[in-house]
Design a protein with these regions (language model features):
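A short glycine-leucine-enriched loop at secondary-structure breakpoints
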Residues: 110-114
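A short beta-strand-turn-helix
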Residues: 43-59
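Short active-site neighborhood of thiol/selenol oxidoreductases, capturing the structured segment around
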Residues: 57-70
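Non-catalytic, surface beta->alpha helical segment in thiol-disulfide oxidoreductase systems
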Residues: 115-156
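Thiol-based oxidoreductase modules, predominantly thioredoxin-like and allied folds used
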Residues: 41-44, 86-105
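Typically the conserved alpha-helix immediately C-terminal to a functionally engaged Cys/Sec
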Residues: 73-89
């Protein structure tokens, strides 16, 4: 093989690798993922489709802000989002949306979220009901979740 053929082959190989890397990155971007499973719970991976679903079902929304590198997020997901009692309540009462604050920085900043984990509850008309900044053990999260449910009942009367 001549030196020119070697250079051309190397350039073609590099081009293929660059295109493959771009395609792989785009296939894993939140814009191409409709759902993400955290713990034992499935969430919409974007605000817009989750909000549309909440409007269609006339349900309140639970938005969970996280990042893949956040230790306290992983701990919350392993404990609270894997607990059957908690996940049953969340799935029955809310449309669930998860926002990766690194990949979806604007969504987080627009809602004044600057740390993870962070949770916001909205009623079915889109009014903010409660915020939970930071990690909560599952028992404390369950107490807070029940408080939110009570506030939702009162606001519907």
């Amino acid at each position: 093989m001549s030196p020119l053929h070697k250079v051309i082959s190397l350039l073609v190989l590099c081009s293929i690798l660059v295109v493959a890397a771009i395609l792989w990155e785009n296939s894993n971007s939140p814009a191409n993922m409709e759902f993400i499973t955290l713990g034992k719970t499935s969430f919409y991976a974007q605000l817009e489709p989750g909000i549309k679903e909440a409007v269609n079902q006339s349900k309140p929304i639970f938005v969970y802000f996280r990042s893949e590198t956040c230790y306290w997020c992983m701990k919350f997901e392993e404990e609270a989002l894997s607990d059957k009692g908690i996940t049953d309540i969340l799935n029955k009462e809310f449309v669930l949306i998860s926002i990766d604050t690194i990949k979806q920085k604007n969504a987080a900043l627009n809602l004044n979220v600057r740390s993870t984990p962070y949770m916001i509850f909205f009623n079915k008309t889109g009014e903010e009901i409660s915020r939970i900044p930071g990690y909560l053990p599952k028992d404390e999260f369950l107490v807070k979740l029940n408080e939110v449910l009570e506030r939702l009942k009162v606001s519907q009367v």
